[in-house]
Every structure is written in structure tokens, then in C-alpha cells.
Amino acid sequence: MEKTAAPRTLLPGDWAVLALLAEQPAHGFALAQVLAEDGEVGQVWTMPRPRVYRAIEDLRSAGLIETVETTPSDRGPARTLLAATPAGAVAVEQWLARPVAHVRDARSELLLKLVLTHRAGRDLRPLAAAQHGVLEQLADRLTAQLETADGQRALVLRFRLAQTLAARDYVADLLR
């Protein structure tokens, strides 16, 4: 019987592990290689091997991944092949489609979502369009606030607006 616990809020690294397992079954060691600093996904989101295994245990406890098979190994412990459960696959699809709410998350979480979506061979445009809308609204709010700001507040708002416009332009390029 699979044990489940009330799912805690998943961190981007947990989502990365879940997305990779929704893409195809894998062993923990293979996941750690993809998420290593020089790995395909690690270029965007790096996770040390112990953190990958911790994410695996947390995702398994939440009922989002399961063991597909376990095979003995000549070297070290048995190899456990893992995959996303149906609930895990649905959760990761929803997460991948959801734009980030803050510009500060564009460099990390948004880029991670884009890389994982691309890696899975899916169209980036739905996420890019949703993210463009969020960033456009944020840019409008910051522009309105900047009209009445002065001093230090204006300095900060100009920086935030520049960052927002750069992120907006980046996702707009993905829509072309």
C-alpha cells in the first residue's frame, strides 16, 4: 500500500524532479545527473544528489511518484526505477502551465518551467502567453506607481519596471 501525506508546498527543485519523472521513469542517480550543475536542467536549477533523494522521498510520501521496479545492483544498493503517479502527472502539468507571480521568480522558476516544457517536447507558447499577461499587468501597475513616486521609492520602482519589461520582452520573443 502506498503511503500518502498531506502534500506540503513543493519547491522548484521538487517540481523539477516530478516533471522529469512525469516525462519518463528514471532512477535517482539519473535524476541527479540531469540536475547536476553541468546537467541539462542543472544549467537552470542545480540540485545536489542528497537534495534530489530528499525530493524523491517527499514526492513519494505525497503520493506524487511511485516505484515502477527495483532491480539488484552489483555495486551498491538496489536500483529503484521511479515514475510520476497519475496525480503527480496532473499536478506537474498544472504547475508547468501556471505563470510565476513575481518578476524575481522569472530568472529561476519561469526559466525552469520553460526548460522542462521544452525538454518534454511541448509548446512553450501557452505558458509564454500567460506569463506575458501577468508581466504586462505588473508593468502597468509599476508605471502608475512611478508617476507619483520620488526619491528612493522612484529609484526602486524604475529598477523593478526595467526588470519587468525585460522579462515581458523575453516571453514576447517566445511568442513569435
Protein language model features and the residues they cover:
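Basic helix-turn-helix/winged-helix DNA-binding cores
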Residues: 1-104
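DHp/HisKA dimerization-phosphoacceptor four-helix bundle of two-component histidine kinases
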Residues: 23, 54, 130, 159-166
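Generic structural signal for well-ordered, non-membrane alpha-helices
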Residues: 33, 57, 86, 90, ...
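Amphipathic alpha-helical interaction segments
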Residues: 51, 109, 155-159, 163
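Amphipathic alpha-helical dimerization/coiled-coil segments
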Residues: 93-140
